[in-house]
Regions:
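Phosphate/pyrophosphate-binding betaalpha-module
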Residues: 105, 111-157
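Generic structural "secondary-structure junction" signal
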Residues: 12, 20-21, 59-63, 68-71, ...
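Active-site diphosphate/adenylate-binding microenvironment
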Residues: 4, 8-69
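Flexible, glycine/proline-enriched loop segments at strand-loop-helix junctions
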Residues: 17-21, 92-96, 142-153
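Hydrophobic alpha-helical segments
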Residues: 34-37, 64, 85, 108-109, ...
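Thiamine diphosphate
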Residues: 53-127
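Catalytic-loop motifs flanking and including active-site residues across diverse enzymes
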Residues: 23, 27, 72-76, 156-157
Length: 157
């Protein structure tokens, strides 16, 4: 009989490098706990991410991981799942990575109904670039890229 895994078993030994107070910490801890509660196998779990603050996620998991290029996590994750259908494949993305740069890939992976889990971190800004507005930024958001306020209405994610 094997000992059930705990949330701590899913945490890697990598230093978490998000900004103090960032909500990404809470998401990471919730995923650690959820995987343990579900009895998921570390050896059959893969996290695929693109670029952005959220995309550091695979480094912080004691599972398999793939840190790919901006917006392409859904495409890579699809390939992982098709080649290894027994794996539990997760896409980790942010509002900029998943809804702007990779919006087309996100749309098509949803349309194809690939057996993936997608966690989209929506902070309404490109955090890694320190404040560029994103597809989910509220209209009027002032940022380095929109000093007069964004004119675009947000995508409802």
């Amino acid at each position: 009989m094997t000992t059930p895994l705990t949330a701590k078993d899913f945490a890697s030994d990598q230093e978490v490098r998000w900004c103090p107070g960032c909500g990404d910490y809470a998401i990471l801890k919730a995923v650690h706990k959820t995987l343990a509660d579900l009895g998921v196998s570390k050896e059959k779990t893969v996290f695929v991410s693109g670029i952005g603050c959220s995309s550091r996620f695979p480094y912080y998991m004691s599972t398999y991981g793939f840190h790919t290029i901006h917006g392409r996590a859904p495409a890579i994750a699809t390939g992982v799942k098709l080649a290894n259908p027994e794996l539990d494949v997760w896409v980790i993305t942010g509002d900029g990575d998943g809804l702007s740069i990779g919006g087309n890939h996100t749309l098509h992976v949803l349309r194809r109904n690939v057996d993936l889990k997608i966690i989209l971190f929506n902070n309404e800004i490109y955090g890694l670039t320190k404040g560029q507005y994103s597809p989910t930024s509220r209209q009027g958001t002032k940022s380095p890229s929109t000093p007069m306020g964004s004119i675009d209405p947000p995508v409802n994610a």
